[in-house]
């Protein structure tokens, strides 16, 4: 015994285990026979685990009662909406595609679980968590591709698909059970009710078959429209456009293929016969000033612009056949909008905040207001202890009546080593040069020079005496040698 479920994700064929769960299979078969499941939404999708369906309205509808069994549906008795579910000990949720009835504990007896119309189909292996909670009555034998699509569906935080996945039709391939009293099989599939239509998020037909039977040109046009909308939204977010749906002005013409010698006055004279021209500008290179061979002409009204468009297309100007079209540029509109926005910001700039908005305060200081005064409070290099006693730092100011301060260890005009922490080469100290010494030090230098001159004279006199003695001794020796001869 089998049932075919036609869903928006594909066809699914289910084999029923009538020998192990006869009452569950009878309930499912008869509900399919009366088209109870038609347009029922797929919900509670858990990837690689399971999904649930069988409620004609679904959990998103406030009017949903959770579904009913075939006996409660035929009689209308609320007590027959559910029936006790049977759990066969040999049937386990071990395989992908296991079909089981969703159950809930009976309010009067929590140990008894009852079923209605909703059923579960597993999307993964070893889903034994459902054992004892869902009553197995069948298994999927065909249509695993549809299970893959449902498994990959985009869902919200509650597991409801953003694009509707619904049961469109049910076909019974084999039914061994007799019809209960009052059952009438509809001749055709009934259309969805108003309550069911209210639960539609995104219609599956529009989403899944939007591009069916559409030629390539139409698909390309749709693709370009989507790209244009995305780019316009991006430009709006970046601030280049006032809004994404901005349209170019209808009173501006775009003229191209111009001769480089054609100027603004020439075009204004030629196009001026169709109406009053507000502006005529040939676009030029910013650096060289050469014409880029296209221009924009703005008319006072739309009618003049249309007349020029129909009359001037392909006209010969300065030996060039020009091309005329309606302008698609929104740069002027963007410039006007941007200038207006900036002027508002400048007007509101004095009101506080950033751009005139009080909540947007641009922070300009990185220290407390009390620390903004430069001077002794700056401690980027020295610690608090090192800053104590530094000349010109934290030392208290002396009054004029106290007299001059006592000289410090380096109060002679030389820079302090601790104050100068630069790693650059030290400049030459001209005060140590010979010719740039202070006047008070010249006397000491003169005395040193006189002392050196005296020592030099004394050494010179000693050398003269030594030479004379050697000469006398040499002369006596020579006389002795002569006398001996």
UniProtKB/Swiss-Prot annotation:
Signal peptide: none annotated. The keyword Acetylation does not apply. Its EC number is 5.2.1.8. InterPro entries: CRIP, Cyclophilin-like_dom_sf, Cyclophilin-type_PPIase_dom, Cyclophilin_PPIL4, Nucleotide-bd_a/b_plait_sf, RBD_domain_sf, RRM_dom. PROSITE patterns: CSA_PPIASE_2, RRM. It catalyses: [protein]-peptidylproline (omega=180) = [protein]-peptidylproline (omega=0). PPIases accelerate the folding of proteins. It catalyzes the cis-trans isomerization of proline imidic peptide bonds in oligopeptides. This is Peptidyl-prolyl cis-trans isomerase-like 4. It comes from Gibberella zeae (strain ATCC MYA-4620 / CBS 123657 / FGSC 9075 / NRRL 31084 / PH-1) (Wheat head blight fungus). The lineage of its organism: Eukaryota, Fungi, Dikarya, Ascomycota, Pezizomycotina. The gene is CYP6.
């Amino acid at each position: 015994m089998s049932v075919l479920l036609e869903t928006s994700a594909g066809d699914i064929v289910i084999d029923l285990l009538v020998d192990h769960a006869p009452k569950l299979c009878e309930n499912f078969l008869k509900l399919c026979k009366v088209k109870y499941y038609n347009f029922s939404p797929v919900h509670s999708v858990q990837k690689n685990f399971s999904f649930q369906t069988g409620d004609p309205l679904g959990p998103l509808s406030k009017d949903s009662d959770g579904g009913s069994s075939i006996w409660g549906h035929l009689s209308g008795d609320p007590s027959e909406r559910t029936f006790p579910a049977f759990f066969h000990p040999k049937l386990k949720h071990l395989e992908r595609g296991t079909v089981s009835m969703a159950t809930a504990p009976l309010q009067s007896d929590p140990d008894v679980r009852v079923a209605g119309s909703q059923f579960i189909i597993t999307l993964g292996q070893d889903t034994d968590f459902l054992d004892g909670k869902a009553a197995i009555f069948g298994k999927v034998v065909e249509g695993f591709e549809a299970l893959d699509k449902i498994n990959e569906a985009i869902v919200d935080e509650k597991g409801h698909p953003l694009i509707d996945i619904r049961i469109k039709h049910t076909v019974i391939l084999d039914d061994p059970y007799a019809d209960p009293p009052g059952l009438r099989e509809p001749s055709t599939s009934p259309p969805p009710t108003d309550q069911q239509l209210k639960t539609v998020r995104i219609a599956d037909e529009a989403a899944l078959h939007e591009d069916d039977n559409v030629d390539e040109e139409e698909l390309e046009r749709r693709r370009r429209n989507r790209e244009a909308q995305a780019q316009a939204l991006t430009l709006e977010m970046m601030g280049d456009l006032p809004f994404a749906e901005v349209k170019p002005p209808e009173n501006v013409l775009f003229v191209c293929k111009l001769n480089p010698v054609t100027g603004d006055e020439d075009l204004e004279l030629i196009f001026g016969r169709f109406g009053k021209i507000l502006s005529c500008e040939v676009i030029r290179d910013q650096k060289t000033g050469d014409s880029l061979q296209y221009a924009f002409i703005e008319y006072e009204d739309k009618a003049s612009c249309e007349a020029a468009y129909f009359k001037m297309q392909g006209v010969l100007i300065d030996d060039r056949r020009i091309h005329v079209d309606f302008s698609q540029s929104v740069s002027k509109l963007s410039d006007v909008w941007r200038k207006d926005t900036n002027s508002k910001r400048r007007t509101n700039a004095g009101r506080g905040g950033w751009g005139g908005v009080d909540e947007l305060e641009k922070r300009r200081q990185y220290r407390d207001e009390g620390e903004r005064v430069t001077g002794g409070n700056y401690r980027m290099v020295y610690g608090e202890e090192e800053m104590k006693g530094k000349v010109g730092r934290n030392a208290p100011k002396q009054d004029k009546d106290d007299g001059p301060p006592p000289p410090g260890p380096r109060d002679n005009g030389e820079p302090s080593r601790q104050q100068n922490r630069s790693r650059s080469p030290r400049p030459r100290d001209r005060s140590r040069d010979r010719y740039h010494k202070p006047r008070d030090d010249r006397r000491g230098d003169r005395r040193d020079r006189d002392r050196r001159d005296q020592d030099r004279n004394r050494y010179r006199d000693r050398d003269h005496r030594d030479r004379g003695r050697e000469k006398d001794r040499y002369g006596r020796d020579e006389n002795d040698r002569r006398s001996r001869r």
